[in-house]
């Protein structure tokens, strides 16, 4: 149920009355003040009244104070706008497919192996899995409050006392065993709201595990792309250095023949050494990316060097991609799911706080045997039992309980703001990735033409220099242009694959809903 009427007039939150709770113990009407007394035959009106009140409390306990959670409405656009005209061949509004294993679309067996190995061995994933196990156990703890607690005990004792009249010592034995039970009846639903919050926390933790897997797959792929980029840049630098070494040799021959100056020779040497100097810096970046991959796979540095050094196919963006509509993306994104489940948990905790404003009801009892000898412990006359009902109600708390409700409502409002922020961030990231991917394709077309033209210009400049038709500066300029545009093309193609990785990450790729076997509840926005 929703809010129950408040049992007391509201006080301002800043009230300064002292805190206290009055515990009203209500013994059965037949009790003589001793727990082990039995009621006289035929006289159990107190027991009947207690049982009646218990049944009534159980009926009321079907209700729960506090707001009932409803998922917030989220206005998502009908389609993505970031693709633009250049991207219409890359994306569509058909349902996204293959998101769970998107890295296989790059057709690189080693990349697929690395991502799957990371998902199995990564320490961040292991930590998130442990966190999920923790909150599952905490939910069991929360749910245990709905049931009675039962315990068993046994004891034996011997006492010695001196009798003044006779001057003798008297020794007495006593033995006992029994069962004790206690139960706090969840009349106003505070415990059930706690279970509701704990269930939502389990679902949020499962979504956070999925978010960790999504981020991990993207990070492994990004570092793998960077490894291949650094390797490509090293090849480009070495190829250009080889070409520039030939130019230096040609210039030296021409200088010996009196057709070139010493200045031309030194300029050619400078150009060559500058290109060679790029290689160590690129190798440093390559090693860093390899080491990062090894850390993501929980491996020691150097474990993957041999495999990553083997030739591999060039990574390329598929000719056509499919992305779902924005609403599908919001349902797929685990971080959005986690934020929504956190909101549900904080909403349930408002009911927990409100339940503290109302009385609490407890039942306790014991059943056992007591005897002066072990031989008679299990005889029919050794049985003892007791039952006790209690009620505790808050009277003066200085506004603390109401302040706790207000504080929890503020926590709920924070969770709502975080959820809305997660939704907007998800939409932003997809749009940015689509724009980057679209523009990258357009840039790639121009760069391919630029590389072809630069190589042709370099060949013509060398031929004309050999024929003595141009000075050496023309050769230097075309050499530098070739190196620059080839590096730019390699970087742009890597950027295209990285944009694809970011797109799949922003779409929530890298996990399957239900893979953690967690109930989804109202997880959909």
Residue map of PLM features:
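Terminal intrinsically disordered/low-complexity segments used for targeting and assembly
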Residues: 3-6, 49-120, 175, 199, ...
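Sec/SRP-type N-terminal targeting helices
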Residues: 126-127, 143-144, 185-213, 263, ...
């Amino acid at each position: 149920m929703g809010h129950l009427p408040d049992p007391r007039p509201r006080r301002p939150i800043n009230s300064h009355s002292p805190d206290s709770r009055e515990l009203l113990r209500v013994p059965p009407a037949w009790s003589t003040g001793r727990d082990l007394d039995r009621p006289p035959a035929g006289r159990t009106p107190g027991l009947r009244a207690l049982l009646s009140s218990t049944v009534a409390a159980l009926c009321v306990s079907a209700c729960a104070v506090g707001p009932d959670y409803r998922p917030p409405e989220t206005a998502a656009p009908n389609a993505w706008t970031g693709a633009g005209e250049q991207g219409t061949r890359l994306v569509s509004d058909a349902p996204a497919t293959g998101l769970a294993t998107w890295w296989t679309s790059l057709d690189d067996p080693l990349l697929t192996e690395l991502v799957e190995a990371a998902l199995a061995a990564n320490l961040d994933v292991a930590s998130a899995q442990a966190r999920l196990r923790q909150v599952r156990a905490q939910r069991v703890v929360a749910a245990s409050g709905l049931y009675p607690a039962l315990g068993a005990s046994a004891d034996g004792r011997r006492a010695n006392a001196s009798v003044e009249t006779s001057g003798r010592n008297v020794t007495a034995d006593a033995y006992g065993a029994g069962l004790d039970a206690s139960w706090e009846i969840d009349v106003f639903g505070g415990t059930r709201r706690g279970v509701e919050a704990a269930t939502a926390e389990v679902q949020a933790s499962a979504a956070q595990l999925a978010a960790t897997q999504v981020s991990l797959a993207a990070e492994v792929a990004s570092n793998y792309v960077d490894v291949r980029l650094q390797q490509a840049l090293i090849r480009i630098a070495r190829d250009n250095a080889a070409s520039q070494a030939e130019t230096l040799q040609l210039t030296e021959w021409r200088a010996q023949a009196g057709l070139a100056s010493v200045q031309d020779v030194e300029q050619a040497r400078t150009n060559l050494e500058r290109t060679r100097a790029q290689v160590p810096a690129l190798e440093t970046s390559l090693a860093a990316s390899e080491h990062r991959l090894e850390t993501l796979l929980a491996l020691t540095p150097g474990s993957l060097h041999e495999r990553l050094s083997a030739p591999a196919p060039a990574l390329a963006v598929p000719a056509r991609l499919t992305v779902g509509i924005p609403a599908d993306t919001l349902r797929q994104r685990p971080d959005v799911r986690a934020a929504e489940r956190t909101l549900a948990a904080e909403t349930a905790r408002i009911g927990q706080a409100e339940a503290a404003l109302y009385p609490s009801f407890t039942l306790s009892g014991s059943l056992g045997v007591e005897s002066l000898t072990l031989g008679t412990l299990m005889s029919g006359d050794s049985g003892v039992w007791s039952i006790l009902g209690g009620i505790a109600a808050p009277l003066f708390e200085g506004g603390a309980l109401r302040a706790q409700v207000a504080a929890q409502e503020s926590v709920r409002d924070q969770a709502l703001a975080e959820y809305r922020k997660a939704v907007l961030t998800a939409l932003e990231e997809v749009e940015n990735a689509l724009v980057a991917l679209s523009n990258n394709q357009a840039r790639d077309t121009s760069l391919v033409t630029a590389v072809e033209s630069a190589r042709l210009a370099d060949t013509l400049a060398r031929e004309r220099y050999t024929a003595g038709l141009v000075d050496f500066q023309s050769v230097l300029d075309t050499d530098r242009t070739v190196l620059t545009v080839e590096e730019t093309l390699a970087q742009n193609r890597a950027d295209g694959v990285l944009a694809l990785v970011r797109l799949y990450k922003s779409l929530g790729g890298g996990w399957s809903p239900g893979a953690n076997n967690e109930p989804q509840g109202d997880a959909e926005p």
